[in-house]
């Protein structure tokens, strides 16, 4: 993106600030939803962290993944930092995959959301239930973990749309279109 004037720089700074404020407002709302209700609710912060990672660089992605992971730990009563490490790793991986290989398509997000959510639910089950060899521990995976996984995937659709709605007017253009290049060259 070519920025010519200080006015354009101020507009870019303003849009970026508003975009990040809205991102973290969504994160806070999802945290509130996760802390209320019953045991069977989606882990909303996983799709939020992944959606934010799709559109940003590695550093913003790892920070957002860590913050969302800490909030998951707080809302679920897990070991502090457990989900932060998992989400920080996956947010870096998702950011790099979208930067290097994938296009920003809905199906790509849904597949990645399903995979990351499953891995997170599986690790949660493995380290909090199966490792202690409780009786009938497989029932917890089938009746609790898998339902939470499905709810998380379904909620990913709505979160993707919300983040897309935020990004549409506020995300800076990374490339100039042919028309913009022609208009720029005509002015010179």
Label for each model-derived stretch:
Residues 1-188:
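Terminal, non-globular segments
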């Amino acid at each position: 993106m070519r920025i010519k004037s200080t006015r354009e720089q101020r507009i870019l700074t303003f849009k970026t600030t508003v975009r990040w404020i809205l991102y973290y407002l969504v994160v806070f709302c999802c945290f509130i939803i996760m802390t209320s209700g019953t045991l069977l609710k989606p882990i909303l912060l996983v799709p939020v962290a992944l959606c934010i990672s799709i559109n940003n660089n590695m550093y913003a992605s790892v920070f957002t993944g860590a913050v969302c992971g800490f909030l998951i730990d707080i809302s679920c009563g897990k070991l502090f930092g457990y989900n932060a490490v998992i989400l920080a790793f996956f947010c870096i991986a998702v950011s790099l995959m979208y930067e290097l290989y994938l296009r920003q398509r809905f199906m790509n997000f849904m597949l990645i959301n399903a995979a990351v959510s499953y891995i997170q639910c599986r690790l949660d089950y493995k380290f909090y239930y199966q490792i202690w060899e409780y009786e009938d521990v497989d029932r917890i995976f089938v009746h609790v973990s898998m339902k939470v996984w499905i709810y998380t995937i379904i909620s990913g659709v709505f979160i993707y749309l919300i983040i897309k709605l935020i990004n549409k007017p506020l995300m800076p253009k990374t490339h100039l279109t042919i028309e913009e290049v022609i208009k720029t060259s005509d002015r010179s």
